[in-house]
């Protein structure tokens, strides 16, 4: 049987982010719903044809999404959060989907959006399903069936994609005060899946890809037993199931997996050994398809196809084999061929989504032709990777000075020498901070004019003087706005930054940036990760001129905002030829240099953002302690040499911090702000446990991603809850994230209400403002 090619999913956003632009135009009522639907159909058809032209035998259907594939699954199961039922008579399915994701209002009553959470260990965000006890699911698969009919018109084999029932339950949350077992909902859920399977079998669908990435985790035994029960129930002879796992190894689950009633297994093999492949081949039922996920869907480096040919060649004679991407190519940019500004030698090291499809075909061709003793295809594979082998000795990637500096610093103790209680007194005296200090996270609204200005400067259409003058004008406006609001710690607003990671990537050696390497983060939000190609250093100061200019405009402290080493690494396409902890160490030394220069220039408040610290945590608990040890040490390297009266802040995304409270405490930052406003109950649990242990904390007091403007009373209610667990001299008041995606009108009202709430609290404590 020939080796078949497939992928688990394809990017949705379009080559030039057409989906992003269409969504935002629709939300702003600039295009009609029909126009939006037309753009969606156009993108799907284009993407399917791109896959077919690249040699993919089975194209995935159902991987397209208007906002998020997990939310799509909730809609398909008619799992609409109770608070949105009031909209059911006024909203069609598409608009209900947007309301759940973004929030809404009716009769002047705010309906809060569902929580947004990171998709396993990626920078993609999904909308968290919400469950209530005794919930009944009902099928609503109109969108999926429409897409299947569109795809069938191409007369090419297709493979519908569904999120599996156990993973769907695992990643969701109960919405009732009293916890209940989510597995109690499985019987109702399985009835809907059976209904979907029956409908698809009538359309003569042969294969369904059913995604169960939760299997890479170390699951409780009750959940593993539920897998056996679920796939017994779902088994039918009319349709075949490819059980799909990704984002890690699943060997610890093989005793359960090999008992499941499925027809094939897809495994992420990007971090496997030869022994792993042999183990899989030996243990899995011989009648199963083994789908080898050998093309890394989360990174942009070429694959050593010849090496994989040698590993897989013997298996092709013994079992049915498919070759695919490790995970969905959702996490990869679309097409390397439209990158016109990358150095050709460097560009030749990379593969984006379309090129990854071609890689899969190349390997399949070689494995299939090998049956005829044809060595031509093998030679093609060898030549394909030659440039990446030569890269390892290139001066572009190797910097002996950086490597030597890393050796010298790695064994030192990087703890701050003075306890926080002493530092806090020095810092509050230096800045004359009131009780409940107010601040923001860093960025302020980025208008189209700012973006155009940056683009013109990047394309050398304006000179440096013109650019600097106009950026300074924006900074001046941002400082003035904050002073009008009477915030306590100001920021310069980051008008010079396109993205918190890409900006530093553009200013550090060891990085390159693409023009069109966009990937989806959530909804219409796209990011363009920089690419780490070599050893990292900071040739000149990066932020000093902007921060110092901002500080010259005000007597209030201005925070220097830097992105931390773990986040820069995690949100970049990282090199794969050295360990991740070494990449992070190089970044820490570069950021440390920037921290010290900020302090020398007179900046006394410095924020090192690490929203990705928790995201980088390995999915398996048994592997987490090693990561946390080096990740915490990496952060400490960036700040260990600052003076006691320099206040160090960090900003993080809340995500199950309860599991790593002790490690968060080891950071020993002076102030931690947390993006958490959509997770109020979980945040309160964290605060209950850690509130009195943490130094100072600024829980995100409102959700900047929602269109809802918080009232003074809403903010006051939240603050009163928080003050039950946080000492009043340790509570800071701030939004939950940067403000760059909001408009000035939106943020003025929200920040004004936030400041009034802080002042009211001070008055209630018998203090002056």
Swiss-Prot record:
Pathway annotation: Amino-acid biosynthesis; L-methionine biosynthesis via de novo pathway; L-methionine from L-homocysteine (MetE route): step 1/1
Reaction(s) the record says it catalyses: 5-methyltetrahydropteroyltri-L-glutamate + L-homocysteine = tetrahydropteroyltri-L-glutamate + L-methionine
Major enzyme class: transferase
Positions with a binding annotation for 5-methyltetrahydropteroyltri-L-glutamate: 17-20, 118, 525-526, 571, 615
Gene Ontology molecular-function annotations: 5-methyltetrahydropteroyltriglutamate-homocysteine S-methyltransferase activity; zinc ion binding
Residues engaged in binding L-homocysteine: 441-443, 494, 609
Gene3D superfamilies xref list: 3.20.20.210
Binding site for L-methionine: 441-443, 494, 609
Catalytic residues identified in the record: 705 (proton donor)
Cofactor needs: Zn(2+)
Record carries keyword Repeat: yes
Pfam families: Meth_synt_1 (PF08267), Meth_synt_2 (PF01717)
GO BP terms, alphabetized: methionine biosynthetic process; methylation
Protein family: Belongs to the vitamin-B12 independent methionine synthase family.
Function of the protein: Catalyzes the transfer of a methyl group from 5-methyltetrahydrofolate to homocysteine resulting in methionine formation.
Protein name per Swiss-Prot or TrEMBL: 5-methyltetrahydropteroyltriglutamate--homocysteine methyltransferase
Gene name linked to the record: metE
């Amino acid at each position: 049987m020939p080796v078949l090619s497939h992928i688990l999913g394809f990017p949705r956003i379009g080559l030039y982010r057409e989906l992003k632009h269409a969504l935002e135009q629709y939300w702003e009522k600039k295009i009609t719903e029909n126009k939006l639907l037309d753009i969606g159909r156009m993108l799907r058809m284009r993407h399917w044809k791109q896959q077919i032209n690249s040699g993919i035998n089975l194209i995935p259907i159902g991987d397209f999404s208007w906002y998020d594939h997990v939310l799509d699954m909730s809609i398909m199961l008619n799992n609409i959060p109770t608070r949105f039922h009031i909209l059911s008579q006024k909203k069609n399915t598409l608009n209900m989907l947007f309301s759940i994701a973004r929030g809404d209002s009716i009769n002047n009553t705010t309906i809060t959006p569902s929580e947004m959470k990171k998709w396993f260990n990626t920078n993609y965000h999904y909308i968290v399903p919400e469950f209530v006890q005794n919930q009944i699911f009902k099928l609503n698969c109109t969108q999926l069936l429409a897409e299947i009919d569109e795809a069938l018109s191409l007369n090419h084999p297709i493979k519908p994609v569904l999120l599996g029932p156990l993973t769907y339950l695992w990643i969701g949350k109960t919405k009732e005060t009293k916890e209940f077992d989510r597995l109690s909902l499985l019987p109702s859920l399985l009835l809907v899946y059976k209904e979907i399977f029956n409908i698809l079998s009538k359309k003569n669908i042969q294969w369904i890809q059913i995604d169960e990435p939760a299997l890479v985790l170390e699951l409780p035994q009750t959940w593993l037993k539920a897998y056996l029960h679920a796939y017994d129930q779902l088994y039918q002879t009319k349709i075949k199931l490819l059980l799909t796992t990704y984002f890690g190894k699943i060997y610890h689950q093989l005793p359960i997996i090999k008992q499941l009633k499925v027809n094939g297994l897809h495994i992420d093999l990007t971090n496997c050994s030869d022994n792993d492949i042999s183990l899989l081949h030996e243990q899995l039922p011989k009648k199963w398809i083994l789908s080898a996920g050998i093309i890394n869907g989360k990174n942009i480096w070429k694959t050593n196809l010849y090496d994989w040919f040698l590993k897989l060649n013997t298996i092709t004679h013994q079992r049915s084999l498919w070759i695919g991407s490790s995970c969905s190519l959702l996490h990869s940019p679309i097409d390397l061929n439209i990158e016109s500004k990358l150095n050709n030698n460097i560009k030749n090291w990379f593969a984006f989504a379309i090129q990854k499809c071609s890689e899969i075909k190349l390997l399949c061709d070689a494995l299939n032709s090998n049956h005829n003793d044809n060595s031509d295809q093998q030679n093609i594979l060898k030549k394909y990777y030659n440039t990446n082998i030569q890269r390892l000795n290139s001066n572009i990637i190797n910097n002996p000075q950086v490597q030597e500096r890393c050796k010298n610093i790695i064994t030192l103790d990087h703890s701050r020498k003075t306890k926080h209680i002493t530092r806090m007194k020095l810092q509050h005296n230096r800045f004359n901070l009131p009780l409940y200090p107010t601040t923001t996270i860093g960025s302020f609204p980025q208008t189209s004019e700012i973006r155009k200005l940056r683009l013109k400067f990047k394309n050398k259409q304006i000179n440096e003087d013109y650019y600097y003058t106009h950026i300074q004008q924006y900074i001046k406006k941002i400082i003035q706005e904050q002073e009008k609001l009477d915030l306590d710690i100001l920021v310069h607003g980051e008008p010079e930054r396109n993205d918190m990671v890409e900006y530093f990537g553009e200013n550090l050696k060891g990085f390159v940036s693409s023009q069109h390497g966009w990937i989806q983060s959530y909804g219409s939000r796209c990011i363009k990760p920089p690419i780490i190609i070599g050893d990292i250093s900071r040739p000149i100061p990066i932020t000093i001129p902007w921060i110092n200019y901002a500080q010259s405009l005000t007597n209030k402290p201005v925070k220097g905002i830097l992105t931390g080493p773990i986040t820069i690494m995690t949100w970049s396409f990282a090199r794969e030829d050295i360990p991740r902890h070494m990449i992070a160490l190089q970044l820490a030394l570069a950021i440390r240099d920037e921290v010290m220069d900020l302090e020398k220039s007179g900046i006394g408040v410095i924020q090192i953002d690490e929203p990705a610290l928790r995201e980088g945590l390995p999915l398996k608990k048994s592997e987490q302690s090693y990561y946390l040890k080096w990740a915490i040490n990496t952060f400490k390297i960036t700040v260990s040499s600052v003076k006691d009266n320099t206040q160090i802040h960090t900003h993080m995304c809340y995500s199950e911090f309860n599991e790593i409270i002790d490690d968060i405490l080891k950071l020993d930052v002076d102030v931690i702000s947390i993006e958490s406003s959509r997770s109020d109950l979980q945040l309160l649990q964290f605060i209950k446990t850690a509130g009195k242990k943490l130094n100072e904390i600024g829980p995100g007091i409102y959700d900047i991603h929602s269109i809802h403007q918080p009232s003074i009373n809403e903010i006051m209610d939240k603050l009163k809850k928080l003050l039950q667990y946080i000492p009043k001299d340790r509570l800071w008041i701030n939004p939950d994230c940067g403000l760059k995606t909001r408009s000035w009108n939106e943020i003025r009202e929200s920040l004004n209400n936030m400041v009034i709430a802080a002042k009211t609290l001070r008055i209630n404590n018998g203090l002056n403002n």
